[in-house]
Amino acid sequence: MQVPKFFFFNLSMLIIGLTTVCKCKDCSKPPKTITVSQSGNANFKTVQSAIDSVPSGNSQWVHIQISPGVYREKVLIERDKPCIYLKGGGGGSTSIEWNDHGNAHFTATFNIKASNIVAKGIAFKNTYNTVDTGKVLQAVAARVHEDKIAFYDCEFIGVQDTLFDSYGRHYYKGCYIQGGVDFIFGSAQSMFEGSTLFFSMGLGPKVDGVFTASEREEDDNSGYVFKNCNITGTGGKAILGRSLNAYGRVIVANSVLSDVVRPEGWESLHHNVSKITFVEEGNAGPGANTWHRVPWTKHLSGSGLHQFLDMSYIDKEGWIANIPSL
């Protein structure tokens, strides 16, 4: 890897350990609406300026309606601006794009540091590796680093390290995530439901890739759950995931796996694999044959599997039900 991901992850976990666990209050309704349009026929012309207008310490839902267009800007939601709902016209018509690479903590096109954030119908793209750069480097489309964050019908497009699903509880519903190497990575506690993971290196020769890269502490509840998803791609083969330390956790269930999935399925960067939890249950498709998988994958059934597939895995207190219907 071009960037030593384990270093940044360990730094992240240290920072998290030194901060208070998020006790995020629910946001109040009804939402206030502000608009964004590049034509100027709106409250703001850029997404960032609309976010900047939200008062510090905000506790009421703010609906930011984004008109169709390609917004070439880097967008940051700071920690003191929770309760924001960004809504576009769909990934095919509303996109936020930037061209940057390097440290994943600071170079993402879309960077979330606040809790209670929702995005719907928006594409987030890092275009660095999709042009003739001559190299494939860490280039993050979105970094998600707080609690109670949801994405509906969104797209995340990149090549290496597309989605930095860093920390907190997250829900991805009906989303499309595209990349080539570790394109969903981090230490978050997240559920991906009815979503598509598409492997594509985007440039260069056909090479093998990695869908996920997971790292967690032994006592954390974190991990990635993929439920009713479509895992596919083109231009090579990819493993479902790799563990960056001794405790990675990824569950793939009731999903369709194409033949893009390599027979061994998984790998670990740590020599001790006994506490890694890589699980495949109830899947279909040519890539779902587990006969040649690495021997240390886990099998879960009944309540052991249900604890991860149930929404309570990421939502015990009902924060998703508090999201406005927009």
Would you name each region that the model predicts?
Residues 2-7, 17-326:
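Sequence-level preference for short, compositionally simple segments enriched
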